[in-house]
């Protein structure tokens, strides 16, 4: 349990470092940095692995175009998707949550169209879809012992090209995937569920508390609403389950 807790803290730290590296690079992250972690896990992924590779590639291509804070904040969809598509969920929960997400993201895209927020509306939509596919792929990947360790060698060209932040992002993402895969095998506690809540929150929070980074109000409000929606949905579902048990 002590080792698992330590591993959880290290994984959270990797998410914070990854978010800060992306911000310090000002979006100058080559798509290769996002592809390397997907290639590392590809041999045991099957269709899910290919979907992960495609989604990570797409997300990587959008980084130079979008504001960094918006790109990082989009990962808050992970806990919401986990709750909405859990076994305890229902069709009404999926529909209501879908309407909330759609409304909030349309608000962001309208703000971008009005010139009040940097970035492009269609790229915002592309990022949202990429995160959804990444969540689906991560949810269908199974732990395995085979990995493409050769893919880590691709970090060397990033370093030689004087792109240390890109190399750091690739290492952090690979480390996060490896840690989550290892913790998935543990039966004592549902660490991956806790990580699903913690990693997106910690990564974005690291940007919020950094004095040199200005988080646009629309981005912060939407992030907070999505996180609140995920938490409230989870709370309501749990409450209903407890009432059913009591009956």
Where would I find each of the regions flagged by the language model?
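Non-cytosolic membrane-interface motifs at loop->transmembrane helix junctions
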Residues: 57-58, 117-122, 218-222
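Alpha-helical transmembrane segments and their membrane-interface exit regions
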Residues: 34-43, 58-62, 76-86, 102-105, ...
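Membrane-proximal helix-loop-helix units in multi-pass membrane proteins
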Residues: 70-78, 86-157, 166
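Membrane-helix interface "capping/anchor" motifs
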Residues: 39-51, 64-70, 83-95, 136-147, ...
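Aromatic-anchored segments of alpha-helical transmembrane domains
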Residues: 54-64, 99-110, 152-161, 199-209
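C-terminal transmembrane-bundle signature of multipass membrane proteins
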Residues: 161-247
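N-terminal signal-anchor module of multipass membrane proteins
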Residues: 1-33
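Transmembrane helix interruption/hinge and helix-loop junction motifs
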Residues: 21-27, 42-47, 62-70, 88, ...
């Amino acid at each position: 349990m002590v080792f698992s807790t330590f591993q959880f803290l290290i994984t959270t730290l990797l998410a914070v470092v990854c978010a800060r590296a992306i911000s310090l690079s000002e979006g100058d992250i080559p798509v290769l940095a996002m592809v390397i972690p997907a290639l590392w896990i590809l041999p045991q992924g099957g269709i899910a692995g290919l979907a992960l590779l495609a989604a990570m590639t797409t997300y990587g291509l959008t980084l130079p175009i979008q504001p960094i804070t918006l790109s990082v904040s989009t990962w808050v969809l992970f806990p919401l998707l986990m709750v909405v598509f859990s076994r305890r969920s229902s069709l009404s929960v999926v529909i209501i949550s879908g309407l909330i997400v759609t409304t909030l993201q349309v608000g962001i895209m309208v703000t971008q169209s009005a010139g009040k927020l940097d970035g492009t509306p269609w790229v915002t939509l592309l990022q949202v879809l990429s995160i959804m596919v990444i969540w689906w792929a991560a949810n269908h990947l199974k732990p395995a012992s085979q990995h493409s360790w050769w893919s880590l060698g691709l970090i060397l060209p990033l370093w030689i090209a004087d792109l240390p932040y890109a190399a750091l992002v690739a290492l952090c993402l690979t480390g996060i995937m490896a840690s989550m895969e290892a913790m998935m095998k543990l039966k004592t506690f549902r660490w991956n569920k806790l990580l699903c809540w913690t990693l997106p929150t910690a990564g974005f929070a690291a940007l919020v508390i950094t004095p040199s980074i200005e988080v646009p109000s629309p981005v912060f409000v939407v992030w907070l609403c999505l996180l609140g929606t995920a938490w409230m949905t989870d709370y309501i579902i749990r409450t209903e389950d407890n009432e059913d048990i009591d009956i």
